[in-house]
């Protein structure tokens, strides 16, 4: 039985797709496989994240780290640092300005 230790989500709304989300997703698959992590990492596309200034974004759980905007050339570093070595790839983090905004569960 496989034990998934991390889930990686890639935004796939229209703006993300226009900004290269599919290429980021494909490169993530390649790098995850290249590091032999395919049995430990779940990789999926997610819908609209409600932000359009840091797209595409990559979210890594269980840490809930948000990277963005991410381009395919940055994926090797992200996978090596965060998923392989277990360190936050600080250079790729989405800025706090891009993460601020209405919190969905507080908006009734």
State where each predicted segment sits.
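Feature of Fe-S/electron-transfer and energy-metabolism proteins
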Residues: 1-108
